[in-house]
Amino acid sequence: MSLSAARSFLSEAAYGEQELDANSALMELDKGLRSCKLGEQCEAVVLFPKLFQKYPFPILINSAFLKLADIFRLGNNFLRLCVLKVTQLSEKHLEKILNVDEFVKRVFSVIHSNDPVARAITLRMLGSLASIIPERKNAHHSIRQSLDSHDNVEVEAAIFAAASFSSHSKDFAAGICNKISEMIQGLDTPVELKLKLIPMLQHMHHDASLASCSRELLQELVSSYPSTSMLIVTLHTFTQLATSSLVDIPEQICLLLQYLKEDPRKAVKRLSIQDLKLLAKKAPHLWTRKNIQVLCECALHTPYNSLKLGMLSVLSTLSGTIAIKQYFSPNAGDSSPAPHHTDLVKLAQECCYHSDLAVAAHGITVLTSIAAFCPEKEVIQLEQETVMGMESLILLCSQDDSKTAQATLKTALTSLVQMLKTCPHLSQSSVELLLRQLHCACDPARVLMCQALAAIATQQPVLVEGMLGDLLELFRVASHRTSEKQQELLVSLATVLFVASQASLSAEVKAVIRQQLENVANGWTVYQIARQASRMGCHDFSRELYQSLRTRVASEHFYFWLNSLMEFSQAEQCLSGLEDGDYSAAMSAISEALKSYQKGIASLTAASTPLSPLTFQCEFVKLRIDTLQALSQLICTCNSLKTSPPPAIATTIALSSGSDLQRCGRISTQMKFSMDEFRSLAARYADLYQSSFDADYATLRNVELQQQSCLLVSYVIEALIIDPQTASFQEFGTHGSILAESEYELRMMAVFNHVLEEVENLSRKHPPVSYLHTGCLCDTVIAILKIPLSFQRYFFQKLQSTSIKLALSPSPRTPNEPIPVQNNQQLTLKVEGVIQHGSSPGLFRKIQAVCLKVSSTLQTKPGSDFKIPLESKTNEIEQKVEPHNDYFSTQFLLNFSILGTHQVSVEASVVDTSGIEWKTGPKNTVSVKSLEDPYSQQLRHQLQQQQQNVPQPAAQRNISTRFQ
């Protein structure tokens, strides 16, 4: 019964629940540990990793590991083995054990057992704990002693423990190195044992002398033991040691290339290729032109496709790095052939048409990278040959639905998209080829080709209206085929149609898609297509799809979510018909859009749940609403120039008051207010950007574009009306159009550049303020609104999930109770935190450090008898902590010299690997009550009593007594 309760706790409890639940789960598991049945004990032990995952704070983990240590000490070998597995699975939580000495003491007691299996399990347990006890001399001694054991199980466990301690302890590695060398070179050591001892040498990299001795020993082993098994283990250990010591990588590359070229055994060649690929990933900058040349010669002359594939994979890894640049940029004085005639290019060209598809895929990858790095005079011919190789591979693989063919096709299409980024003049012919091939390709290949088409068309407007007929016919054909990839193919084809239509779907396209979706598509496919329509700006069609889906969901939260999306699409559709110069229609359209947005934000709020608060979505929509309101107000302000023009004496008033803005009349004040409002909106967009740590790059770029549009409007107001002399728009530059990666971004950039040109021309020709200036402002508003808003992926889907959970100590016994502290003492506030990830941690960015900001504010006023020193009103402390295994801990010393209740806030933000700070939260608060220390209180009371006991002076005579 107790274990079922524990399982329910661990399966149903979510992040952020109360500490009581963690203690309850631990108590239930403790009951299982104390059970008389071995099965229940084992089941309780194996549930501990889930407990650590749900409640990853040191207090609970320390208690749990102490209980596991007791089971390890008192249980049988099977229970010990279960505890060992739990420890190895929970390696990232080991540093949270507070009582390390007590934990190790209980575990280490088993090392004195007469049972060699128990000793072996203990050694493996100690090896698993090496990260927290690297310098324990008793553990070092036990490992040395067990290496001389006559029991094979114990010796293997000692080797495992020795390898673990060697990787963490410099002293242990230096001390054990000679013993390991003697055992490896000893004639009485079996070959099987030598094969297990040799990999230990890869950890002897703590200093140069130790690494040099290990390398000399490995070099001797390579010469003395040329057998295949021994040579493979020795060479791989050689590579691992070089990877850690770094300075020996060039020598190791030469050694591996030597064995690849000269050793006839395929197993040795495969191992050499495997290690060369490892070194290519680790240190591509250390590969010389000669190294790559030797590898190319080996690949050209080998008769085995498997070995050629391996060598090409190494070259493929190097092709995207600086190594290729070094290959085509020899040192001064070197006489090298033209790039087109090098062995690397010959090899890549030869492999592009190889019968083995995997070899051909790597050949295409290498050739694509060469075309990007090659000198200008050679690049044209290489570009054409590369595209021809891609096209032949696409033709070959598009009709084969095997996994190998599809993987090759994906590689070829990825290379094609990359190639067309740098060579846009080749886009049209490549797109035409893909469209022709779509008719005869299999469904899995069609999905990949449609995705490639969408990626190419997003970068370049190559899908013209004449191609829509072929795409619609493909959509009709796809709906009649029943295959596993049918639904995915419908989504991919619809995406290509949206890109080709450029946010203006014709009635025929809508009718065809709608009819086919009604016939064969399931609800999820319809939702995916609607989502793509929202991303591409086809809001009219997405509104219809969301409306049809509202009644097909089983949860009211999903209903409100779809209803909000429908309202947002309706709102954006209201803005799609704007025309230049029609300002009254623009006002009406914005008003209708705001009505739909207000309905949508109400539904969006109803769709949020505690586990899915939809924070980004709500804030993004609120900003959109406020932006539309600000744009509407700006048009009204511009129109006020007609209804309330500047008075005739405006210039005189401006000269007498010294304010140049007065020459424009009342419109200047309104424009100043609008400019400040748009700058405030830009700052809010910047805050939204900084709080979206898990967002994909396209979503962040979209938020940045919205921010830049607000800055652009504020700049136009300042440049045309407020202060033309000092106005500047540094936040935007013309270089942005070169870096644009989507059609939406290209259109926004075009509008920005056009507006900036108009403003510059107008400000030079006409002095402010005139109808030309207000007309330019209104035209800017309409130009921005005419571009359909793109709802990017993060609005619908979170691919990366990162959250931080904080724990503060001391903590109050009850939530509303303040922590008492005397005013002459300082409070030590300990802040602990864990970083929790979703299924794809670090997909877009990784956390390098956590920034903790602690501040305190006085909540209640102190008594009138106490003076408040100004410097002691608040605590403001900031500290950066680098997390280790997703855990961090630090302490703050806070001063509360002022009596009263203080509110202490701890806010966390993260710094990614690029050094950018993100305001992710959370923000925890705790109340602290500053009390007067007893000694000062006693002195104050004594002083008050003395003042009360002093006799009062005689009262003065009143006026009546004076005249008596």
Swiss-Prot record:
Residues 937-964 are annotated as: Disordered. One of its GO terms (biological process) is DNA damage response. It is found in: Nucleus; Chromosome; Cytoplasm. Its main location: nucleus. Keywords: Chromosome, Cytoplasm, Developmental protein, DNA damage, Nucleus. Disruption phenotype: Fishes have a defective lens structure and abnormally shaped jaw and neurocranium. Residues 937-958 have a biased composition (Low complexity). It comes from the Eukaryota. One of its GO terms (cellular component) is chromosome. Pfam families: INTS7_C, INTS7_HB, INTS7_N. Belongs to the Integrator subunit 7 family. Component of the integrator complex, a multiprotein complex that terminates RNA polymerase II (Pol II) transcription in the promoter-proximal region of genes. Component of the Integrator complex, composed of core subunits INTS1, INTS2, INTS3, INTS4, INTS5, INTS6, INTS7, INTS8, INTS9/RC74, INTS10, INTS11/CPSF3L, INTS12, INTS13, INTS14 and INTS15. The core complex associates with protein phosphatase 2A subunits PPP2CA and PPP2R1A, to form the Integrator-PP2A (INTAC) complex. This is Integrator complex subunit 7. It comes from Danio rerio (Zebrafish). The gene is ints7.
